[in-house]
């Protein structure tokens, strides 16, 4: 457990349309509603969530620990525990709880870049795109790290500003991005083009040699998924099925729903069993008019 996510490839960004499941927590996870949260007056703010007792703060990775050493020892330990708790909450799928932990960490150590990074990525995961954008802008100013730009651009998409997303991506030459961030930037740019009703342009952005990468990188399933989803939007169903299948082959953990999309093309549907379970638990009349009572035992 690292405590603070490292760079945008650790965050969920979206390659489809706002509201799609990219099928995009990483370019490719379920997007949120993009609502802007309202800052509460200080007296109305909820208390910080309790940190689980088993979290010591020593679980934090070296990069984060190095930055936290700029703080007084006791404060640094508290912030480390908050960041580890946030990381655990994200792993458990509770983005709102992660955001609460990182908000408290920011209150205590808002001048530390990894704290702002953690809050930005937690807000992004929670669908609070306005907060995520503000925090990641701050990280970019503090560190000069351009690898956050794809996530920032995806926040603009979440706020229904696809043109701003494209403008932001255009500010940074691909040569200034890491290999992973370059791919994430293309996925987000393609999503923005689709938002603007330009699926052909989106497809061109995604037609890169990395689609056929032999090594399984974190971004490969999301890239193939975005490509397949764009093909499907263009009505190229046979090609789309091929690429959804190729995405599923490199997505054993199911970060995307590529396997389900393949099944849909094959005419297989998945039904929620929740309603059936509820029905099974409902009390039934002792004597149903449609059922003959059995013999007494």
Region spans (language model):
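Structural motif corresponding to the intra-repeat A-B loop/turn of tetratricopeptide repeats
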Residues: 92-93, 126, 159, 196, ...
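Residue-level signature for tetratricopeptide repeat
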Residues: 88, 120-122, 153-155, 192, ...
């Amino acid at each position: 457990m690292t405590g603070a996510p490292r760079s945008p490839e650790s965050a969920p960004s979206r390659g489809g349309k706002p509201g799609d499941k990219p099928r995009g927590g990483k370019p490719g996870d379920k997007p949120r509603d993009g609502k802007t949260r309202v800052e509460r007056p200080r007296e109305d703010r909820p208390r910080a969530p309790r940190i689980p007792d088993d979290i010591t703060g020593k679980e934090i990775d070296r990069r984060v620990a190095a930055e936290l050493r700029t703080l007084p020892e006791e404060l640094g330990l508290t912030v480390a525990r908050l960041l580890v708790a946030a990381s655990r909450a994200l792993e458990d799928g509770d983005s709102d709880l992660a955001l609460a932990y990182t908000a408290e960490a920011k209150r205590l150590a808002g001048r530390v870049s990894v704290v702002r990074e953690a809050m930005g990525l937690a807000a992004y995961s929670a669908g609070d795109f306005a907060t995520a954008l503000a925090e990641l802008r701050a990280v970019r100013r503090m560190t000069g790290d351009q690898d956050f730009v794809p996530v920032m651009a995806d926040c603009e998409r979440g706020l229904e500003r696809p043109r701003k997303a494209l403008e932001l991506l255009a500010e940074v030459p691909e040569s200034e991005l890491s290999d992973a961030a370059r791919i994430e930037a293309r996925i987000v740019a393609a999503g923005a083009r689709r938002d603007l009703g330009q699926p052909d342009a989106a497809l061109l952005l995604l037609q890169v040699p990395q689609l056929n990468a032999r090594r399984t990188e974190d971004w490969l399933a999301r890239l193939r998924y975005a490509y397949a989803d764009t093909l499907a939007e263009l009505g190229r169903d046979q090609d789309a099925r091929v690429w959804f299948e190729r995405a599923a082959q490199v997505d054993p953990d199911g970060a995307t729903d590529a396997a389900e999309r393949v099944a849909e093309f094959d005419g297989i549907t998945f039904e929620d069993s929740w309603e059936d379970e509820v029905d099974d638990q409902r009390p039934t009349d002792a004597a149903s008019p449609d059922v003959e009572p059995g013999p007494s035992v």
